[in-house]
A protein has these predicted regions:
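Adenylate-forming
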Residues: 6-12, 19-206, 217-222, 232-235
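C-terminal reverse transcriptase regions that engage the nucleic-acid substrate
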Residues: 1
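Short, highly charged C-terminal tails/helix-capping segments
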Residues: 227-241
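Short conserved active-site loop signatures built around small residues
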Residues: 208-211
Length: 241
C-alpha cells in the first residue's frame, strides 16, 4: 500500500533517502489540554496525535484508509529488561477515518494501537512476507510515513570536567517519505518533520504542520464535547477558510 498524499515532485524509480527537517513547538498550555482530552477518552498522548495526524493525512489525500508506522522497544519479556542490545521492531498502524464522532474515532485509534502493541513481537520482515507485498525500490513496503515519540530527553550530559551536548549532523537521511517525531518536554510538545526532498518541498511541510497544529488546537477544545462530529474538527487556518 502506498499513500495517496499529493507529491510536489514525481516519485523516482529508486528512493535516494535525501531529506530535510523542520522543527516546531506547541505550547505547554496546549500540551496540558491535549493530555486532558486524551485522559477523557482513555488514550495516550501518542494515540491522540496519531488520530489527529491520520485525519490531516486523510483530508490531504482524500483517502479514509491511512497507514503509518511506529517503532516499538519490543522488550515485553522481563528477562530482556536488563540486557544491552537493539530489540526495536516496527509496528504498522492502519486507521480508518470514516467515523461519525470524535469518541468513536478515538476508540478506534486506541484499539488499533493496542492491537499492534499486542503483536509487537512479530518481526516486521515476517509481516511483509506474510502480506505478500510487491516490493519496489521507489518506496518502503506497507507504509511510507513514520510517527514516533521520544521517551528520553536529548538534553546535555554532564561528567566530571566534561560537558556533552547533542549536535545535529549536516544533511539528513530520510528513510521514509515523511517522518514525524514527537518530543514531550517541560516547555511543551516538540514536533520534528523529516521529509524526502525528492518528493515534497518545504512549503508542503509548512502546510501539513499548520493543519496539524490547527487540528490539535481544535481537539484541545473538545473536553466538554467528547461526541463532537468528526467533520466539525477544523484544520484550516482563518486565512484559508
Amino acid at each position: 500500500m502506498v499513500h495517496s498524499l499529493p507529491l510536489d515532485y514525481p516519485r523516482p524509480a529508486e528512493k535516494v533517502h535525501v531529506g530535510a527537517q523542520q522543527h516546531y513547538q506547541l505550547s505547554e498550555q496546549l500540551l496540558g489540554q491535549l493530555h486532558q482530552v486524551a485522559r477523557a477518552h482513555d488514550c495516550t498522548l501518542f494515540m491522540l496525535v496519531h488520530g489527529a495526524l491520520s485525519l490531516v493525512l486523510s483530508r490531504h489525500s482524500y483517502s479514509q484508509d491511512i497507514v503509518v508506522g511506529t517503532p516499538v522497544a519490543n522488550r515485553t519479556q522481563q528477562e530482556l529488561e536488563p540486557l544491552i542490545g537493539f530489540f526495536v521492531n516496527t509496528l504498522v498502524l492502519r486507521a480508518n477515518t470514516q467515523h461519525e464522532n470524535l469518541r468513536s474515532y478515538l476508540q478506534h485509534i486506541r484499539q488499533v494501537s493496542l492491537d499492534a502493541q499486542a503483536n509487537q513481537d512479530v518481526p516486521f520482515e515476517q509481516l511483509v512476507e506474510h502480506c505478500q507485498v510487491q516490493r519496489s525500490s521507489s518506496h518502503t513496503p506497507l507504509f511510507q510515513i513514520m510517527l514516533s515519540m521520544n521517551t528520553t530527553s536529548a538534553s546535555s550530559l554532564s561528567l566530571p570536567d566534561v560537558s556533552i551536548t547533542p549536535l545535529a549532523g549536516e544533511g539528513y537521511q530520510c528513510k521514509f517519505d515523511l517522518e514525524l517525531t514527537l518530543d514531550e518536554t517541560t516547555s511543551g510538545l516538540g514536533l520534528t518533520w523529516g521529509y524526502d526532498t525528492g518528493l515534497f518541498n518545504a512549503e508542503r511541510i509548512v502546510q501539513l504542520q499548520g493543519h496539524l497544529a490547527e487540528l490539535l488546537s481544535a481537539l484541545a477544545r473538545t473536553v466538554e464535547q467528547p461526541d463532537m462530529p468528526l467533520r466539525a474538527l477544523e484544520m484550516l487556518s482563518t486565512e484559508e477558510r
